[in-house]
């Protein structure tokens, strides 16, 4: 789902780690 993916990316952006490390981080 692109909307869920977009939300996860928006959540990950404030972090300092690369996006690929947020695959199981997510926003729940």
Swiss-Prot record:
Q: Which SUPFAM superfamilies match?
A: Phospholipase A2, PLA2
Gene Ontology terms, cellular component aspect? extracellular region
Primary location: secreted
- What tissue specificity does the UniProt entry give? Expressed by the venom gland.
Q: Which UniProt keywords apply?
A: Calcium, Disulfide bond, Hydrolase, Lipid degradation, Lipid metabolism, Metal-binding, Secreted
Q: Which cofactor does it need?
A: Ca(2+)
EC number(s) per UniProt? 3.1.1.4
- Catalytic activity annotation: a 1,2-diacyl-sn-glycero-3-phosphocholine + H2O = a 1-acyl-sn-glycero-3-phosphocholine + a fatty acid + H(+)
| Swiss-Prot/TrEMBL GO biological process terms | arachidonate secretion; lipid catabolic process; phospholipid metabolic process
Q: Which positions are annotated as binding Ca(2+)?
A: 28
Task: Specify whether ATP-binding is a keyword of the entry.
Answer: no
Q: Which GO terms describe its molecular function?
A: metal ion binding; phospholipase A2 activity
Q: How is the cofactor bound?
A: Binds 1 Ca(2+) ion.
Q: Where in the cell is it found?
A: Secreted
The family note in this entry says: Belongs to the phospholipase A2 family. Group I subfamily.
Quote the function comment for this protein: PLA2 catalyzes the calcium-dependent hydrolysis of the 2-acyl groups in 3-sn-phosphoglycerides.
Please tell me what else the database record remarks about this protein. Answer: Is not toxic.
Question: What is the name of the protein in this document?
Answer: Phospholipase A2 pseudexin C chain
Species name: Pseudechis porphyriacus (Red-bellied black snake)
